């Protein structure tokens, strides 16, 4: 069998940033330096001062 190198850590692209709260790499909001996934953002948005516009 051939030796397999371990993957390099991602430095750019969609999978490079992680959610600071849960650690997932899916749908991370980077705006305003939040670095939260959309699920975590919806949970704590009111405490951060964001409100829903209609």
UniProtKB/Swiss-Prot annotation:
PANTHER family attached to this UniProt entry: 40S RIBOSOMAL PROTEIN S29
UniProt cofactor(s): Zn(2+)
Purpose of the protein: Binds 16S rRNA, required for the assembly of 30S particles.
Residues engaged in binding Zn(2+): 19, 22, 37, 40
InterPro entries: Ribosomal_uS14, Ribosomal_uS14_arc, Ribosomal_uS14_CS, RIbosomal_uS14_euk_arc, Ribosomal_uS14_sf
Record GO terms (molecular function): rRNA binding; structural constituent of ribosome; zinc ion binding
Single biological process term from Gene Ontology: cytoplasmic translation
Cofactor note: Binds 1 zinc ion per subunit.
Keywords tagged on the record: Metal-binding, Ribonucleoprotein, Ribosomal protein, RNA-binding, rRNA-binding, Zinc
Subunit structure, as described in the record: Part of the 30S ribosomal subunit.
Protein name from the UniProt record: Small ribosomal subunit protein uS14
Xref: HAMAP family: Ribosomal_uS14_2_A
Family: Belongs to the universal ribosomal protein uS14 family. Zinc-binding uS14 subfamily.
Keyword RNA-binding: yes
NCBIfam families: PRK05766.1
